[in-house]
């Protein structure tokens, strides 16, 4: 069981200009005292073909963490356009919001981002050289993809098992009956909109989601290049990990501090 659970993420300024800062309102719950801070990061995927163009937009140390439900604002700079291939400035890409404890990542939230010109004229007849000031970004906040990772927290008892438990009865199961059953079940859950997200939640602010524990994946990443065009509403392909929900307005503890750099002290947040 995770000591820290992500409850909700609200993309605050969306849509926005490409050059505007990213603002996220993040709500999470801490079940017990932690000895170290949480480190949040936002990464911009600059290319769908190579991670050499990935940019870490900002990182933030949050702590000490009071037990209970906490909320804070994460602000990150826009990407450096000089580090993005010119032919991939426009179109759909991905941003990844991650959190780690003691260098071990335990949750990742990915969003599709559509970058396009503000005017129909530029959309229909784009200039050879992109005009950055005229580009607008739109984060598909209602369709995030959430991935959880089991990690060791402060105690050895919290560490995930190094090896899977022995299953001697597994050899007695007929291979032809069981082979591929898990893969088929997983494909069925992905095809089900109720499982894969995408449902609008009435009465919630735009871009707000609630992260449900049973909707999170226990294993690694999801390749967005295999997502269908229907899920993007015709907006293209990209890489990353992206799931769905709504937000809750919950107060945070009064002892938590936020550092805008891993080696610096930050400001205290009020309850």
Curated annotation (Swiss-Prot):
Q: Where is this region: Disordered?
A: 152-271
Task: Tell me which UniProt keywords the record has, alphabetically.
Answer: Chaperone, Chromatin regulator, Nucleus, Transcription, Transcription regulation
Any one GO MF annotation of this record: histone binding
UniProt lists the gene as asf-1
- InterPro entries in the record, alphabetically? ASF1-like (IPR006818), ASF1-like_sf (IPR036747), Hist_deposition_Asf1 (IPR017282)
Name a biological process GO annotation.
Answer: DNA replication-dependent chromatin assembly
Q: Which protein family is named in the record?
A: Belongs to the ASF1 family.
Write the protein's name. Answer: Histone chaperone asf-1
Q: Compositional bias (Acidic residues) at which positions?
A: 168-185, 211-258
Q: How does it assemble?
A: Interacts with histone H3 and histone H4.
* Family matches, as Gene3D superfamilies: Histone chaperone ASF1-like
What organism does this protein naturally occur in? Answer: Neurospora crassa (strain ATCC 24698 / 74-OR23-1A / CBS 708.71 / DSM 1257 / FGSC 987)
Per the entry, what this protein does is: Histone chaperone that facilitates histone deposition and histone exchange and removal during nucleosome assembly and disassembly.
Name of one Pfam family that matches: ASF1_hist_chap
Where is the protein localized?
Nucleus
Q: Name one GO cellular component term.
A: nucleus
Q: Which domain of life is it from?
A: Eukaryota
């Amino acid at each position: 069981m995770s000591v820290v659970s992500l409850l909700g993420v609200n993309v605050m300024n969306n849509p926005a200009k490409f050059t505007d800062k990213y603002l996220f309102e993040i709500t999470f719950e801490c079940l017990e005292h932690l000895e170290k801070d949480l480190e949040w990061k936002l990464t911009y995927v600059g290319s769908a073909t190579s991670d050499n163009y990935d940019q870490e937009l900002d990182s933030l140390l949050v702590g000490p963490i009071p037990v209970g439900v906490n909320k804070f604002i994460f602000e990150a700079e826009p990407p450096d356009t000089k580090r993005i291939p010119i032919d991939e400035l426009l179109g759909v890409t991905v941003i990844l919001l991650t959190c780690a404890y003691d260098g071990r990542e335990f949750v990742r939230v990915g969003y599709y981002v559509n970058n396009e010109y503000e005017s129909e004229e530029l959309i229909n007849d784009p200039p050879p050289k992109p005009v950055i000031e005229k580009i607008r970004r739109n984060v598909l906040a209602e369709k995030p993809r959430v991935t959880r990772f089991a990690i060791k927290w402060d105690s050895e008892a919290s560490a995930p098992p190094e090896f899977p438990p022995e299953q001697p009865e597994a050899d007695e199961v007929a291979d032809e009956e069981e082979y591929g059953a898990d893969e088929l079940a997983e494909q069925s859950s992905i095809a089900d909109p109720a499982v894969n997200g995408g449902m609008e939640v009435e009465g919630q602010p735009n871009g707000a989601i609630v992260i449900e524990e049973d909707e999170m994946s226990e294993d690694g990443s999801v390749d967005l290049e295999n997502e269908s065009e229907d899920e993007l509403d015709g907006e293209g392909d990209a890489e990353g990990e992206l799931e769905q929900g709504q937000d809750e307005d919950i107060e945070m503890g009064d002892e938590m501090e936020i550092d805008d750099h891993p080696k610096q002290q930050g400001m205290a947040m009020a309850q």
